[in-house]
């Protein structure tokens, strides 16, 4: 599972997710990708589940790039503990996703295989996403999927 090796601060504020993604909103490595249409916290487990779904479908062909990294710790206090006495221990790690962010990229497979693999991965994610392709492969942006 993805998580940082070491961090400067163990606990961080929740922050706000406003605006669009200014970085990471274009395809850089692959020919096809999944682009976020909404904002969310994407957990390390969700990223891994989507990666496994794509990898198992394309079998040995093609490359997959994960373009997001969960670098934000989310803390949680144990059940049955009274309020106060500081912030809880880090429970899991999330990546902050804004609209327009490319989550995964893929290359080395035909478009129909990439589209189906990305569709399987989209079902593992908590936000609406869309399939995108490079300009030289015909269409620029695919249609929006429900999940």
From Swiss-Prot:
GO BP terms: translation
Sample GO molecular function, one term: rRNA binding
CDD domains: Ribosomal_L16_L10e
Keywords: Ribonucleoprotein, Ribosomal protein, RNA-binding, rRNA-binding, tRNA-binding
Keyword RNA-binding carried by entry: yes
Classification via InterPro entries: Ribosomal_uL16, Ribosomal_uL16_bact-type, Ribosomal_uL16_CS, Ribosomal_uL16_dom, Ribosomal_uL16_sf
Gene Ontology cellular component list: cytosolic large ribosomal subunit
Superkingdom of origin organism: Bacteria
Subunit details: Part of the 50S ribosomal subunit.
Family note: Belongs to the universal ribosomal protein uL16 family.
Stated role: Binds 23S rRNA and is also seen to make contacts with the A and possibly P site tRNAs.
Protein name: Large ribosomal subunit protein uL16
């Amino acid at each position: 599972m993805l998580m940082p090796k070491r961090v400067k601060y163990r606990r961080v504020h929740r922050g706000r997710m406003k605006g669009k993604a200014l970085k990471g909103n274009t395809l850089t490595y692959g020919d096809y990708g999944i682009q976020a249409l909404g904002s969310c916290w994407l957990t390390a487990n969700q990223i891994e589940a989507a990666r496994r779904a794509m990898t198992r479908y394309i079998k040995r062909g093609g490359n997959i790039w994960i373009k997001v990294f969960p670098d934000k710790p989310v803390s949680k206090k144990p059940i049955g503990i009274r309020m106060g006495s500081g912030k809880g221990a880090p429970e899991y790690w999330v990546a902050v996703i804004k609209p327009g962010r490319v989550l995964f990229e893929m290359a080395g497979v035909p478009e129909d295989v990439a589209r189906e693999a990305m569709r399987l991965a989209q079902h593992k994610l908590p936000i609406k996403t869309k399939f995108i392709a490079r300009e030289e492969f015909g269409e620029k942006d695919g249609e929006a999927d429900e999940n």
